[in-house]
């Protein structure tokens, strides 16, 4: 198969480009999903122990009639990241983000609108093909209608500011989204339509597609016309249902540990067993690590070391289940003295790196 311009596409496992060193045993690594637009940012990542960086190829020029990446654009992004001794194995699709559907430039897939969604799905096929040609082995995306819901920011330690979500404080006077009334069955039908058409292409080109669960789950009775954020229902049941749909080694999760905690009524007890079961599927392709204080419908995001989820235990479980991809810090708290959050993310990088090293020592029988 070819992409625009006639370039022949190879499967990612047999492609040109540097990518992962085939002689290095697979293992967990410290990653980041933070966007890097200059060498200084890449060097900041490298200094703090990051090995793998999620890439953001240029947004396709829709005004010129092209809605997908060219392989040359993905290659340029990959080469830029690799120039500082880092790896790019995952790219963020140019649409299907964690955006309120009303603000989305390309909402047709989530609205179930044909033929527009078929055009957008074809563009995703071409993005997957472009990644395969240059050795990018994964892409990540969301299936979001409501975007990331928050209700306030509250004070945290050292004068930091923390994201809060309380279902009771949502503004229930807001109208439905442009999607109108969407019950759970309809939401699943739209996800199924997407997976049915994209998973075979992911398999053909050996590029893994990784979906982030909706953040957070919807309150009882739904919100703004959406009955249920279906991947984020209590007990993690939506995640297992999602993985069973069009089951494939190339269809999986960009699993956010914080979002998983947010969908549970008793996260401090429930999360470890659910994570182990998900780990055994071998369908987690990336991890976002954040912590919370609270439970479903009422939580505050915290610093990674002070929440109710034991992140060292999380990383030990991932190691025990053979997880061998990146772990990225996520939603680090804000502070006025740290407008770019470089201080906060440095804390996150160090915390994760220490936990990974601890898990490796534990696995090697060292104390």
Predicted regions span which residues?
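Ligand-binding pocket scaffold of soluble enzyme catalytic domains
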Residues: 20-66, 72-73, 79-88, 92-93, ...
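Short, flexible loop segments at the rims of nucleotide/cofactor-binding pockets, characterized by
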Residues: 30-33, 117-118, 230-231
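Histidine-acidic metal/acid-base catalytic patches
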Residues: 3-27, 82-83, 101-104, 110, ...
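Active-site-proximal loop/turn and secondary-structure-junction residues that shape catalytic pockets
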Residues: 34-37, 59, 94-97, 143-147, ...
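A short acidic (Asp/Glu
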Residues: 42, 66, 151, 221-222, ...
């Amino acid at each position: 198969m070819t992409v625009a311009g006639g370039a022949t596409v190879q499967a990612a496992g047999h492609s040109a480009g540097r990518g992962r060193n085939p002689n290095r045993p697979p293992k967990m690594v410290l990653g980041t999903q933070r966007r890097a637009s200059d060498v200084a940012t890449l060097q900041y990542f490298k200094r703090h122990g990051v090995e793998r960086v999620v890439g953001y190829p240029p947004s396709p020029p829709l005004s010129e009639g092209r809605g997908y990446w060219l392989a040359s654009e993905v290659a340029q992004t990959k080469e830029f990241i690799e120039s500082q001794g880092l790896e790019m194995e995952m790219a963020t699709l140019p649409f299907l983000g964690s955006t309120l559907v009303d603000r989305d430039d390309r909402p047709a897939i989530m609205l179930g609108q044909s033929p527009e969604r078929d055009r957008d799905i074809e563009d995703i096929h071409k993005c997957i093909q472009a990644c395969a040609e240059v050795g990018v082995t994964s892409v990540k995306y969301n299936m979001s209608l409501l975007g990331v819901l928050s209700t306030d920011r509250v004070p945290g330690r050292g004068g930091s500011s923390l994201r809060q979500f309380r279902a009771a404080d949502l503004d229930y006077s807001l109208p439905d989204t442009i999607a109108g009334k969407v019950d759970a069955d309809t939401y699943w039908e739209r996800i199924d339509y997407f997976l049915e058409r994209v998973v075979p292409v992911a398999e053909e080109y050996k590029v893994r597609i990784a979906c982030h669960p909706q953040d957070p789950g919807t309150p009882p009775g739904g919100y703004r016309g959406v009955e249920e954020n279906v991947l984020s229902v209590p007990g993690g049941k939506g995640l297992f249902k999602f993985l069973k749909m069009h089951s494939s080694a190339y269809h999986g999760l960009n699993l956010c540990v914080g979002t998983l905690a947010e969908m549970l009524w008793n996260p401090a007890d429930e999360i470890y067993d659910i994570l182990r079961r998900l780990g055994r599927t071998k369908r987690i392709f990336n991890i976002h690590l954040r912590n919370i204080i609270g439970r479903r419908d009422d939580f505050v995001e915290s610093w990674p070391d002070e929440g109710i989820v034991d992140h060292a235990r999380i990383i030990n479980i991932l190691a025990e289940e053979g997880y061998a991809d990146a772990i990225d810090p996520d939603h680090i708290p804000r502070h006025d003295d740290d407008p770019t959050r470089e201080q906060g993310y440095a804390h996150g990088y160090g915390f994760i790196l220490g936990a990974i090293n601890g898990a490796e020592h534990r696995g090697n029988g060292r104390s």
